[in-house]
Amino acid sequence: MNELKNDRYLRALLRQPVDVTPVWMMRQAGRYLPEYKATRAIAGDFMSLCKNAELACEVTMQPLRRYPLDAAILFSDILTIPDAMGLGLYFETGEGPRFQSPITCRADVEKLPIPDPEQELGYVMNAVRTIRRELAGAVPLIGFSGSPWTLATYMVEGGSSKAFTKLKKMMYAEPQTLHLLLDKLADSVILYLNAQIKAGAQSVMVFDTWGGVLTGRDYAEFSLNYMHKIVDGLIRENDGRRVPVTLFTKGGGQWLEAMAATGCDALGLDWTTDIADARRRVGDKVALQGNMDPSILYAPAARIEEEVSTILAGFGQGEGHVFNLGHGIHQDVPPEHAGAFVKAVHALSKPYHQK
C-alpha cells in the first residue's frame, strides 16, 4: 500500500505530536455538496450508491477535492449489517430507513445469520479497496460500523424511532433475547470491521448514535459491554501501523471514564460535553474527537472561527485532539461554510502544537 503523505489524523488519535490539529467532518461526503447530489442521481438511490464501489469511491473523494481534510471516511451506511442478515432494508421518502422484516421475538433473533463480510458485505470491502487505491496515500481512510445497541434500535423498531418503546420493552421484559441479539451483532461487527481493516481501512470508528437514550446502568449492560467486546476483538495493527479505534456515543458525555476503560484509542464527543472537562477526565487515557455543534456551520465565517477558537482553547496545548463536528454535517449547510471551518482549524491550531 502507498506510504501516507499526511498521517496527522492517525498520530493525533495515538496522542503523538502533530503540526496542526487534524480535522474531518462526520457525513463529509453528503447532501450539502452539489456534486454528491449529482452522483447520487446517477446511482438512482442511496443503497445503489453504497453498493457501487466506483460511485462510493467518487463521493468519498468529493469533499477531499474541496477541502484540505486530514482523513477520508468510507461512504456507506451503518445498516449494512442488518440488511446482510436478511431484514430487507429500504428507504421511505422523508421517513428514513425501514426494515421489511423487523425483529419481533426470540425466534427471529435465533435464526439471524452472522454475515460473511467478504460475501454478503463484499460490496463494502470493494469500496474500501477502491478508495484506498484512489487516495494513493494522500490521507488515511476511516472504516466504521454502528454499535450493536444502535443497530438493534433499528432492527427491533423497524426503522427510526423517537421513544424506542419496542426495544425498551424487549430490554426490560425479555433481556436475554436482547442480549442474544446484541451478542450476534457484536460478533458481526468484529468480523465486519476486521474485514475493512484487511481491505485497507487505517482506523475504525463505532457509532453508538442511540446509546444516550439509556440509563447509566442500562448503557453499561446493553451498549458499552458490547462495544468493549468489539474493541477486544479488533485487529489493532496492520501494514506495520497501529489501527486506532474510536468509540462515539451521542449523548454519552457522562460515561467517558467507562468508555475510556474499554481500551479504545479515542472517544468522540458531541457538542453537549465540554471538551476541557472531557480532557481533564480522560485525556491521559484516550484522544478526543469533536466537538462543534454542526448548526454553527449556518453562521458567518467569523462566528465559525470564533467557535473553533473556543474549542481549541478548551482542549488546550498538546496532542490528542482530532477536530470534528459533534454529529453529522446538516444537508443544507453552504459548502463554503464547511470550507471556512476546515481552514480555521488548521490556521488557529498551530500555536497549540509549538514546542
UniProtKB/Swiss-Prot annotation:
Q: What is this protein called?
A: Uroporphyrinogen decarboxylase
Similarity comment? Belongs to the uroporphyrinogen decarboxylase family.
Query: Pathway, per UniProt?
Result: Porphyrin-containing compound metabolism; protoporphyrin-IX biosynthesis; coproporphyrinogen-III from 5-aminolevulinate: step 4/4
- EC number(s) reported in the record: 4.1.1.37
| This protein's UniProt keywords | Cytoplasm, Decarboxylase, Lyase, Porphyrin biosynthesis
Question: Where is it found, in Gene Ontology cellular component terms?
Answer: cytosol
Q: Where is this site: Transition state stabilizer?
A: D77
Q: Which domain of life is it from?
A: Bacteria
Its GO biological process annotations read: protoporphyrinogen IX biosynthetic process from glutamate
**Subunit and interaction comment:** Homodimer.
- Keyword Glycoprotein belongs to the record: no
Q: Does the keyword Cytoplasm apply?
A: yes
Q: Which reaction does it catalyse?
A: uroporphyrinogen III + 4 H(+) = coproporphyrinogen III + 4 CO2
> Which residues does the annotation say bind substrate?
R27, Q28, A29, G30, R31, D77, Y154, T209, H327
Pfam families in the record: URO-D
Give a short account of what the protein does: Catalyzes the decarboxylation of four acetate groups of uroporphyrinogen-III to yield coproporphyrinogen-III.
Show the GO MF annotations. Answer: uroporphyrinogen decarboxylase activity
Q: Where in the cell is it found?
A: Cytoplasm
Query: Which organism is the protein's source?
Result: Yersinia enterocolitica serotype O:8 / biotype 1B (strain NCTC 13174 / 8081)
For this protein, the record's CDD domains field holds: URO-D
